[in-house]
């Protein structure tokens, strides 16, 4: 298991992470805490939020800081990353988070996850897609070098609706956040109509390497959402990276 140390990100905020992944940790912190990429709507204090692709817990920590009374259902399949997620919840004394060590998909399965110890947030069930994406990155760039170390780990994948169906008296899902490195459509197709009807907002980050952008946008619109599209300013011009921000009509 990768070494984990506490990384100080601001005067009053630190997280546990693999120190070799510090570049990625700082990037995610900026994206969520400074650029506020998930501040897509005002949410109720007691929001119910789904974190698909929990990584080391940065999104969940941000939402719990902003909405302390919220309930968050989080999913992270990589064992080392899930362990770090749990340590970060303990570090910040967070309650109201139900974390599951699994990925989300259209059906239950056991699949091979390609894990990047120095870039764990890029770990993927679709390694070929990730390899194709990296072709648009200069191979001398630090990110390309950090992505060179990989290994495979077998992980469980389950349907999101199977978890939502076990939540007592679930009235609304105020936000579904999906950042799952190529498995976005799998996550969305693991939702039954009864649960789609409960969702108010969806934010999906995806790289359109296999036509999923149009498919995801069409699916979200068919479920009653107005979909806005943003391109992250950090993405290279030939990397088809998008944020789909879907709000219920």
From Swiss-Prot:
Query: Where would you find the membrane-spanning parts of this chain?
Result: none
EC number, UniProt record = 2.1.1.-
Molecular function, one GO term: methyltransferase activity
Induction / repression: Expression is positively regulated by the cluster-specific transcription factor tenR and is induced during cocultures with the natural competitor fungus Metarhizium robertsii.
Catalytic EC class: transferase
Q: Which UniProt keywords apply?
A: Methyltransferase, Transferase
The source's superkingdom equals Eukaryota
Pathway-wise, it operates in: Secondary metabolite biosynthesis
Q: List the disulfide bonds.
A: none
Pfam families per record: Methyltransf_21
GO terms for biological process, alphabetical:
methylation
Q: Does the keyword Methyltransferase apply?
A: yes
Concerning its family, UniProt says:
Belongs to the FkbM methyltransferase family.
Q: What does this protein do?
A: Methyltransferase; part of the pathway that mediates the biosynthesis of tenellin-type 2-pyridones, iron-chelating compounds involved in iron stress tolerance, competition with the natural competitor fungus Metarhizium robertsii and insect hosts infection. Methylates pyridovericin-N-O-(beta-D-glucopyranoside) produced by the UDP-glucosyltransferase GT1 to yield pyridovericin-N-O-(4-O-methyl-beta-D-glucopyranoside) (PMGP). The pathway begins with the assembly of the polyketide-amino acid backbone by the hybrid PKS-NRPS tenS with the help of the enoyl reductase tenC.
The record ties this protein, via NCBIfam families, to:
fkbM_fam (TIGR01444)
Protein known as: Methyltransferase 1
Q: Which organism is it from?
A: Beauveria bassiana (strain ARSEF 2860)
Q: What is the lineage of its organism?
A: Eukaryota, Fungi, Dikarya, Ascomycota, Pezizomycotina
